[in-house]
Amino acid sequence: MVKLSCVIVGVPGDPFQVEIDEICELVAGLKDAIKKEKPDSIKCDADKLQLFKAAKEDRTFSASGAEEEKKDFRWLKAASDDVKKLKHGEKTAAIEAVVRKDQVLRGKETVSDVLMGMESPSISQIHVLVVLPEDSESEGGTSAQPAEKERLLKFLREQAADKKRKRYWHSEMDMDQGWELLDDFDLTVKPVSTVHAEADPADSFNWQSDLVQDGQEVVLTEEQQRGRYREYVERNIGAVLKENKLCVTAVDEGENVLSVDVPKLGIELRGRTDLLVLSDIVEETSDYLMHLPEVKMLIEVKRDAEASDFQALSELIALDILAEDPVMALLTDLNQSWKFFWVSKKSDDSDCICKATIKSPGEAFQVIRALLTASAETKLPCFHQPLKRLKLSQHRGYKNAECLQQYYKVAEVSGPDYELARAVAEHLVRSMPGYCCANESEP
């Protein structure tokens, strides 16, 4: 009699042992023994199991380092990384190489054939890999569902662990972080030239100053003048706003409406912008702001806008993920610097962010007015070619609908799972912008 250690591929769980007669037992009998040992994990008929010899190729080398023609096979070590991943339902490249279809053990082979040329089996080794049939789910369900559950739980736990994520605050985005963020999203910035266009004249915004007691003039901060510059922007595009039922809303400190998770990249974007152009329904109640209804663009206002490009890029990426339609970002000093950013594509069809600079307030407002009434692809003032705004096509987060779909898939076979249901619910709540706004404050 011999004891063989087995692992079911794709199903989380520890190795288990079966005892068989190595001399006369057929592989078909080994299948029966495996099913008998794991009745809760294996619901299909035993003859539908695929068994593989858990042996890795071990090439030998001469003293000179040259590879010799002789190739040995050795059992997988129970303590190896490959087997550790197997215990969690994962497959490595080495395991994929073992479970190739041309290496499946035939039912009429004997166990002695399997052991031929191998070292004597021991408890520190893995000897047989078990693969369940692909259609086993339709036959009453198998532990492929627990495997799906474990994968989903692992994903959800990683999202809940802040230490495993990279967090960016828009307001702290310097050059180093900015380039790192673009690299994370595999994005490049493409400058776009502009031309002079006839436009209604518009005055520059007058940044106010205060006189302190010693007579020194001090310019008030952007924060202190947000109400004034919001009215300035609204005044210059008011007719278009009214016609399209839009408004310009100032985002107060602490309202981190541009907070979003990007689970696929392990990234969190946090913070807000200064102004948003969106549906005027938000004027009915401030609660609607977190939902960003029909948002068209964000406006980041800086007294000196020359060194804040990466903050605007970060805010654009966050708004793109949160919004249903293509959006635009504007970084401006409300005087001679009006930088527009939007998502587009390069010639190789990869995502990029386009950047165009306009130096006249009149021309800038002409572009904004046209933008708010145009489709995603249209001819705008000051641009040579029609401007095509798109959505980021990659790196989207794990969608909430996918989490629910996977949960229902598991529950359909194994019944309600309260641990998984709680994890999915917490993930859904964490992904809500309102949750971020209520539970986080900008550093």
Curated annotation (Swiss-Prot):
Transmembrane residue ranges: none
Top-level taxon in the UniProt lineage: Eukaryota
Compartment list: Secreted; Host nucleus
Keyword Transferase set for record: no
Motif placement: Nuclear localization signal 1: 161-170
Pfam families: Crinkler
Region annotation Effector domain: where it falls in the sequence: 134-439
Renumbered residue ranges of the record's region DWL domain: 57-126
Region (LQLFLAK domain): 18-56
Keyword Oxidoreductase: no
One Gene Ontology cellular component annotation held by this UniProt entry: extracellular region
Position of sequence motif HVLVXXP motif: 127-133
InterPro entries per record: Crinkler_N
Sequence motif Nuclear localization signal 2, location on chain: 384-393
Signal peptide positions on this chain: 1-17
Keywords, ordered alphabetically: Host nucleus, Secreted, Signal
Family membership: Belongs to the Crinkler effector family.
Function: Secreted effector that exhibits strong cell death suppression activity and suppresses cell death induced by a variety of effectors including CRN63, Avh241 and Avr3a. Protects host plants from biotic and abiotic stresses such as salinity and drought by up-regulation of many defense-related genes, including ABC transporters, Cytochrome P450 monooxygenases and receptor-like kinases (RLKs). Also enhances resistance to Phytophtora pathogens.
UniProt note: domains: The CRN proteins have modular architectures that include a signal peptide, a conserved N-terminus, and highly diverse C-terminal domains. The conserved CRN N-terminus harbors a distinct LXLFLAK motif, which is followed by the conserved DWL domain. A highly conserved HVLVXXP motif marks the end of the CRN N-terminal domains and forms a junction where diverse C-terminal domains are fused. The conserved CRN N-terminus mediates the translocation into the plant host cells.
Name this protein carries in UniProt: Crinkler effector protein 161
Organism: Phytophthora sojae (strain P6497) (Soybean stem and root rot agent)
